[in-house]
């Protein structure tokens, strides 16, 4: 997957989460979680874009670590919403799956970037 494709994918992830949260937002119990989920999901795309513009390998790795954390946070809030509102399961599953796939890509990218950084030092 190219950087441009992943930029589009993380943007779409943010859109999908926002549309999902629009549906669950009227539930007073879930409002705070929906707001946090929107912030975290938009941060995934924003920080990935920032990583693509990193000024150094160290900067790139640090920004990708933020993406990793935010993506994991999205998964946590999706799981929490699913537990609190079990009927949201069908809506949560594809978004959670996408978050997990993005997280896997980011974790692998981090591993590669760290290996490349180590090989430069050797």
Please state what every model-predicted region is:
Residues 1-122:
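Short, C-terminally biased terminal segments at protein or domain edges
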């Amino acid at each position: 997957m190219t950087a441009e494709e992943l930029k589009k994918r993380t943007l779409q992830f943010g859109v999908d989460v926002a549309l999902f949260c629009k549906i669950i937002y009227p539930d007073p119990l879930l409002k705070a979680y929906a707001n946090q989920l929107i912030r975290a999901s938009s941060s995934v795309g924003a920080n990935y874009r920032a990583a693509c513009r990193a000024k150094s390998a160290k900067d790139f790795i640090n920004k990708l670590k933020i993406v990793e954390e935010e993506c994991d946070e999205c998964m946590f809030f999706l799981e929490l919403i699913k537990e609190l509102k079990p009927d949201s399961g069908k809506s949560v599953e594809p978004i959670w799956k996408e978050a997990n796939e993005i997280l896997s890509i980011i974790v692998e990218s981090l591993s590669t970037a760290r290996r490349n950084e180590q090989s430069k030092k050797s």
